[in-house]
UniProtKB/Swiss-Prot annotation:
The keyword Amino-acid biosynthesis applies. The gene is trpA. It comes from Mycobacterium intracellulare. Its EC number is 4.2.1.20. Tetramer of two alpha and two beta chains. The active site is at 56 (proton acceptor), 67 (proton acceptor). It comes from the Bacteria. The alpha subunit is responsible for the aldol cleavage of indoleglycerol phosphate to indole and glyceraldehyde 3-phosphate. One of its GO terms (molecular function) is tryptophan synthase activity. InterPro entries: Aldolase_TIM (IPR013785), RibuloseP-bd_barrel (IPR011060), Trp_synthase_alpha_AS (IPR018204), Trp_synthase_suA (IPR002028). GO terms for cellular component: cytosol. It catalyses: (1S,2R)-1-C-(indol-3-yl)glycerol 3-phosphate + L-serine = D-glyceraldehyde 3-phosphate + L-tryptophan + H2O. This is Tryptophan synthase alpha chain. Keywords: Amino-acid biosynthesis, Aromatic amino acid biosynthesis, Lyase, Tryptophan biosynthesis.
Amino acid sequence: MTVKQSEASRLGPIFDVCRDDGRAALIGYLPTGYPDVTTSVHAMVALVESGCDIVEVGVPYSDPGMDGPTIVKATEAALHGGVRVRDTLAAVEAISAAGGHAVVMTYWNPVLRYGIDAFARDLASAGGYGLITPDLIPDEAGQWLAASEEHRLDRIFLVAPSSTPQRLAMTVEASRGFVYAASTMGVTGARDVVSNAAPELVGRVKEISDIPVGVGLGVRSGEQAAQIGGYADGVIVGSALVSALGDGGLTALRALTEELAAGVRQRAAAS
């Protein structure tokens, strides 16, 4: 079975531009509200200015079962600071105003509490391109699929090395924009060695679809970004950016983002 990427994808043209440049897209994640709401928004704009093609705007959640310790600590701080979903939507607006491309990454419970259609409507109004839902599977996403069609939003589901062929095909078919490939089993976090399972997982998706594949869960350096950019359409970085922001503020965040952006372009120069 071959699954054709939907022409209605909002993110598709961004991946097309990167592909024309001979490189992967750089996708950076930060949680809203860390270390505080205002700084987090400035940080996301800094990602755009420093070379991120797509910014993942995180909605802090009290039970982040798939996040590593760095992101858990940051989201706990954001929640203690009183962050709200509306702050995430404001961050999306700021990214859009800066010429960037924002998707929201959230566990499903905050969307249910907000209201699925209302969230989709407000995300689209803020200039968002789509939603990454790590704990939502396509079988249980009927209302979200309908809302994403109504409001022209991309829907990014996760696949993992453990995904069966049937599960992989179902997830890819339900996705639009890109598929999020978990390069290691378990929770997220920066690692010194990127999982060998990632190229195989990307290859499995490519066998059945032309949808772009983003690989995350471990990148921390420009060298790793170049490595992953050799086989993936998108290089996703989260924990390392959160650490840079927490340890060195906007200056360190910009420096790491520029290194990562150079990394995906190194791959282009080598190809």
